[in-house]
Regions:
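Short, conserved non-catalytic motifs in the polymerase core
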Residues: 19-21, 99-101, 106, 262-272
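Flexible hinge/switch segments at interdomain interfaces of large molecular machines
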Residues: 4-12, 55-56, 149-159, 251-266
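GHKL-type ATPase core
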Residues: 1, 58-81, 92-215, 221
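Bergerat-fold GHKL ATPase/HATPase_c domain
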Residues: 1-35, 84-86
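GHKL/Histidine-kinase-like ATPase module
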Residues: 175, 183-184, 190, 194-311
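A conserved short beta-strand within the histidine kinase catalytic ATPase domain
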Residues: 48-54
Length: 311
């Protein structure tokens, strides 16, 4: 028999198709999905602060100071835009070219997937002078959007508890989240991200917490990666340019070790397998340095042909 799975039901039936797997990796991916929404707001210039909290019960709360998810009635769906974003796959600002110039998020499945895979999710939106709130369970709304307070702030807070009947692991690892938030701070200079773990109380009575912020972005990232190595050049080479409306940024340095470490990203997503962006960079670097060496007659005495790997 042929089954047609509607909307979020499909996510609950085949979660791995949407978030990769249902173990530790997928569990942490839920947090990245929500944080990526806030980062998209930051990249559009509307958000400067993102706060991630691991609560005592291993639920997660992510707060930002962006514009807040829209709450007005969605024309086509006839429901609040907030409910549409949280219950319809591929809904949101990143599929319309005008809203975001850059957007991350996995395959654009977005925060509706997080909702589908959580026993409880609560969205609070600060927008138009009011606090709007809606709660969900396993992707289904428990009630319509309610106005619960007045406010002069803007932003979104999403709290969610991953579904233990879907995930084989439900305990969040602080270090995994810290690594990703640190990386996001380096990739998005000027934004502040904070991680707090309410499961760990320090001696002074405060919770374990860390703030990630970088003013110099990739340049600082390279220094951080290279911090334990012996440098060959005094500072990081940093290039920022734009080609056909697409911003490109490169930071590199040389040290005395023989192993290279290369990290490439597109829209904040680590492209582990490389791609044309990395291949193009390697070609450009090789060609430029080779030409410089030839023009400066540095290669006349060399007995061997130098290759890209030599750079």
């Amino acid at each position: 028999s042929i089954q047609v799975l509607e909307g979020l039901e499909a996510v609950r039936k085949r979660p791995s198709m949407y978030i990769g797997d249902t173990s530790e990796k997928g569990l942490h991916h839920l947090v990245y999905e929500v944080v990526d929404n806030s980062i998209d707001e930051a990249l559009a210039g509307y958000c400067t602060y993102i706060d991630v909290v691991i609560n005592e019960d291993n639920s997660i709360t992510v707060t930002d100071d962006g514009r807040g998810i829209p709450v007005d009635i969605h024309e086509k769906e006839g429901k609040s835009a907030l409910e549409v974003v949280l219950t319809v796959l591929h809904a949101g600002g990143k599929f319309d070219k005008g809203t975001y110039k850059v957007s991350g998020g996995l395959h654009g499945v977005g925060v509706s997937c997080v909702n589908a895979l959580s026993t409880y999710l609560k969205a609070e939106v600060r927008r138009n002078g009011k606090v709007h709130m809606q709660e969900f369970s396993c992707g289904k709304p428990l009630h319509d959007v309610q106005v619960i307070d007045n406010t002069d702030k803007t932003g979104t807070t999403i709290s969610f508890k991953p579904d233990g009947s879907i995930f084989t692991v439900t305990e969040y690892k602080y270090d995994i989240l810290a690594t990703r938030l640190r990386e996001l701070a380096f990739l998005n200079a000027g934004i502040t991200l904070r991680l707090t773990d309410k499961r760990v109380l320090k001696e002074d009575g405060s919770f374990k917490s860390e703030v990630f912020h970088s003013d110099e972005g990739l340049k600082e990232f390279v220094r951080y990666i290279d911090r334990s190595k012996e440098k060959l050049i005094p500072d990081v080479i940093h290039i920022v340019t734009e080609k056909q409306g697409i911003p490109v940024e490169v930071a590199l340095t040389y040290n005395t070790s023989y192993n290279e470490s290369v990290f490439s990203y597109v829209n904040d997503i680590n492209t582990i397998e490389g791609g044309t962006h990395l291949a193009g960079f390697r070609r450009g670097l090789t060609r430029t340095l080779k030409k410089y060496a030839e023009d400066s007659k540095l290669l006349e005495k060399a007995k061997v042909e130098i290759q890209g790997d030599d750079f």
